[in-house]
Amino acid sequence: MPKEWYISFHGGDEKTSLNNIHVYSTDGKKLRKALNKKSVPEGITLRELRGFAFGPDKNLYVVNAYFEYSEVLKFNGALNKDGRHDFAGVFVKRHTDLNPGIDHPFNVAFDCNGDLYVSSQNTSIVARYHGPAGKHGQPGLPMPFPQSLDPDLNLPPGTFVPSAKHVSNGLVEVREAIFAPDNNLYVADRAADCVRIYEAHTGHFLRNLVSGSDQVDRPIHLLLSPDGRYLFIGSGGTDSILRHDLRQNSTKVFVAPKSGGLNGPAGMAFGDDGFLYVASRNSNEILRYDTKGGRPSSKPFIKDLADNPEFLMLVG
């Protein structure tokens, strides 16, 4: 099967809101919706989908971010006869007492052990949940606090990286969290104008990788280069993309402010064609930039989207 682009959108209750992951061909043609809504049971509503990832079990995990829902849904990784993913269950569900940490979640990431990490905007934490294999606990339930956290702190169950309300090196306004090749967790802190690094297994705060002095301004999305050398940072305050060299510990502007019409950099992904694809959230476009020098293509890859694009992934 040829590779395809999966794109999530802001969603909501407007007529133009797109509350599904939409599929596009590698030449920008709209193909279909990725998630089979007919398979979703009554009582579950897809609204404001954000980050999504294929888990270690090959199934598709999707953030259902609307604050009243605040959950991670699981869909079969294998496509049905219509080329869609059928609903498989609610993997992580918000609960006022047992799981209050997941609140308006943003993205999901799996660690090398197959456990799931979820960043939540309203609580400004990254929470950790037992992965689908359930090696040490029931899949989807909050995991114990890492050893770096004081057990006497009144933290939501499953907290891996706490908010700045609880610890000095905590998160002020969390957005995307991803794992690097060194297995450490890189977290965009939008309001603090920095990307923070936490040790993978202990949750120990290591350092701020980049900050305002490196021209980081309201970072939201993160992406690692295929070789793991560079970290790309969407800088929302300047409508630019920075590239941090993890070996040299140096940061440069890779995509200049508003280059190619960039307005609200959101999800980023590499294509197989030598381009970096970027969701331009406020202009409802998917843009392309040369991976060598950050030069924009002469025209948008996809334009006139009905809703604000959020996350994108090349699948196949």
Segments predicted by a language model, with ranges:
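Short loop/turn segments that connect beta-strands within beta-propeller blades
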Residues: S25-K29, N76-N80, H130-K135, E199-H204, ...
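Blade-level signature of beta-propeller repeat domains, shared across WD40, Kelch, NHL, RCC1
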Residues: R281-G316
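A short beta-strand motif characteristic of beta-propeller blades
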Residues: K30-G43, D86-N99, L141-S168, H204-S213, ...
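Short loop/turn segments immediately following the C-termini of beta-strands
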Residues: H10-G12, A65-F67, Q121-N122, G131, ...
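Conserved beta-propeller blade signature
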Residues: E4-S8, N59-V62, D115-V118, N184-V187, ...
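An edge-strand/N-cap motif at the start of beta-rich repeat modules
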Residues: M1-K33
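Beta-rich, blade/repeat-based domains predominating
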Residues: P2, T16-L18, V40-D57, H95-N113, ...
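A short loop-to-beta-strand structural motif that recurs across blades of beta-propeller domains
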Residues: N19-H22, E71-K74, S124-R128, D193-R196, ...
